[in-house]
Amino acid sequence: MPCLARLLDLADVSDSSSKANGSNPIGADRSAQLPAAWDPAAVEENLYQGWVDSGYFKADPSSDKPPFSIVLPPPNVTGQLHMGHALDHTLMDAMARRKRMQGFEVLWLPGSDHAGIATQTKVEANLKETEGKDRFDYGRDAFVGKVWEWKDRYGGVIQRQMRAIGDSVDWSRERFTLDDGLSRAVQTMFKELFDAGLIYRANRMVNWSPVLQTAISDIEVVYSDDEGELVSIRYGSLEDSEPHVVVATTRVETMLGDVAVAVHPEDERYTDLVGKSLPHPFLPDRQMIVVADDYVDPEFGTGAVKITPAHDPNDFAMGQRHDLPMPVIMDETGHIANTGTEFDGMERYEAREKIRLALEEQGRIVARKFPYVHSVGHSERSKEAVEPRLSEQWFVKVEELAKMSGDAIRSGDSVIHPSSQEPRWFDWVDDMHDWCISRQLWWGHRIPIWYGPNGEIVCCGPDDEAPTGEGWYQDEDVLDTWFSSALWPFSTMGWPEKTPELEKFYPTSVLVTGYDILFFWVARMMMFATFASKHTPEILGTGKDGRPQIPFNDIFLHGLVRDEHGRKMSKSLGNGIDPMDWVRDYGADALRFTLARGANPGSDLPVGEDAAQSSRNFATKLYNATKFALMNGARVGELPARETLTDADRWILDRLEEVRQLVDDALDRYEFSLANENLYRFAWGEFCDWYLEIAKVQIPRDWDSATEEQVQRGIRTQIVLGRVLDSVLRLLHPAMPFVTETLWKALTDGEEGYSESLVTADWPTADLTNGGAQTDADAVRRMADVDKLVTELRRFRSDQGVKPSQKVPAKLDFAAADLANFEEAVRSLVRLETPEEDFAETASIEVRLSQATIAVQLDTSGTVDVAAERKRLEKDLAAAQKELDNAAKKLGNENFLAKAPEKVVEGIRERQRVAQEEFERITARLEGLPKA
């Protein structure tokens, strides 16, 4: 047919073997490149390795492209990916992939943390189990060697998991907090701080782990409500007429360290006692002075509190205010020591019981309350109750550093997203206590301090020669893991050396992490970065208006991943989810899209199996839709003249551009949920469910018998299909890299001007979506009318008991509603046949549209089995009634309403509303059925 030959020329078809024999005139069927079904496990590993081998993820500091850089929050070297990591990595990877597509030179720098306590504890436990030895049996050097062996053997797990979920990091730049370069940076920073007078050694209160025998940080202390006993002890005379006070404690054993009793200065009950002394029950040489202090709450208990300055942080503060002695009554293992009493050598819990019994014998136990539930801090690693304990440790003086950190946010040099987290930042940095940086461990950065035989203290930098000779020795402690982590943004790029990486990529563009470590990690990075900038401006540069350089321009704080009921994931609840299980069961894209679709700045993210299945189904939907489009000739190419396109063509292109703009705006604000939810709704609800269905009508089923106009329309539809698919796959690539890469390669394979991979393809702009055209309001209106008409007719068919596959003769006036061009599409979408002469109306419906109310008459005779329909409806009615009963039962339970999360209650109310509507609809339908 001549007209087809001319159109093939217009379509620029290079496949000369393609013939107009009823086949697709565009050329070979590209869908043949795709297997019958989407199987992520079959392609993900090879796709990822191909990206790595092609060097797509490598950063070039000599590039002229604008820089975009992120440093990966370093996971524990022997750790495994948990859902919090998976969220972190998904969001960072989405940012990195999008920025590459936007033409940035991207550095996403990976690495891992030596994780002092976590790693040492794990290795010690393994050695105890396998060899029956502890670290002291080996000695320091041999034990550290064992830890390195463990790290080398088990340290690659999380890296393999990162590859499995698609992290586009530059593996050639992977760092470790104990590698030579970072060790040099740590020693340099310690020396700089020490020389500036910001590092000092002192006796201070710390969280002490008797099992680990080290101080631990606040973040490594987990609080839980424990059952204990509240014991009231009488100090002073046993005669009521003589001076005495009653104090209460849950830690009876600490009374061996009591040096005073505190009361409120305005508490008249104790006015005469203030300044007097009370004898200690077990230590006759110790007199406990009664002091007045505003800390005491006169309304709580007896209004008097015991003061144990060396074993309670609040008591320590009072001890400093009143210049009290601070005897430490417990050794590193949690045993009573150096009290000169019969209790020395007892483990703390044994001593608690023995001391209580001894006090009872003296008649000093006034009351016992058991069980008494109170909050107790436990070591996250060793699980035992932490002991507040006065200990000589190394500290960083934070006042100056904290001020610079606060100023960095106040000035806008670094911006926190969401801004609602700013008050928490200022609460911490404006009221920060000096930071204990020493740990009594062997695995880590050893403190670079040497002590001489005559009391000398020497701090050595990496290029200094450590003092040697008789009597000289290095400090035994190591630095808190957070010390080296605080240097991460710039030490990983070569500081303290001046490097091309620092010049190109520092400060980093954005830090992505959870709000729960805003203080523990983020604030400390800000402190060290601003300090380093101030002292080495020639390396790190200077910030705006001469202020210290910040380590990251933006701080994006996401929430915690919770279970589908909003509960924190924990071993005790058994509600934890291993992200690698989802990768195995649903594919990496399903995991990533579930997390990206739910992630908003600062908000917690509830996830469950249903969400993962939904994301898996979305990937499958994309796959099947692309395969169908390719089978029908979808291809990339120049858009035809806009006036030649159908309303549906213009509508889908304009909607694509609207969604593109929304996605760009949302991602620029780190609103991943908004961006991906809109992509999901557009791709599934508008492109797959609507435009693809209309495209089936616009593309000829038999090209041989098609008119010239139908062939032209079909070819234009194929190009629009290709254009929309091209853009949708690009927009979804940051969140779903594997399925989009697979489909995009099938769509663009061999096309001139297209890159080999989506990783390096251009990010969509208006030119790529709808050619930069203005939205066609008439097309939008008509498509909205088609949407409403089809939806109402489908619902009406269902209400009439017509099976979805059953074609029904129908009369309706499309011209009156300005939908004449959509008659074929609507009839196809609703399965309506053109009526014959013997048409007999059995049902009708009126649908109000924008231009007119359209009347539709249907002939359903012979299409409905009344008895079967009645049985089906009665079954559905019973199901709706059951749902209503269940909802009413739950919503009528006051105990349930008080405990259930608001989202759960809202979900039940919504199901109740839907069930009520369903009940009423089915009832009406049953009443309308012909009587038997």
From Swiss-Prot:
A motif ('KMSKS' region) lies at residues 568-572. The keyword Disulfide bond does not apply. The keyword ATP-binding applies. It is an enzyme of class 6 (ligase). Pfam families: Anticodon_1, tRNA-synt_1, Val_tRNA-synt_C. Keywords: Aminoacyl-tRNA synthetase, ATP-binding, Coiled coil, Cytoplasm, Ligase, Nucleotide-binding, Protein biosynthesis. HAMAP family: Val_tRNA_synth_type1. Belongs to the class-I aminoacyl-tRNA synthetase family. ValS type 1 subfamily. This is Valine--tRNA ligase. It comes from Corynebacterium jeikeium (strain K411).
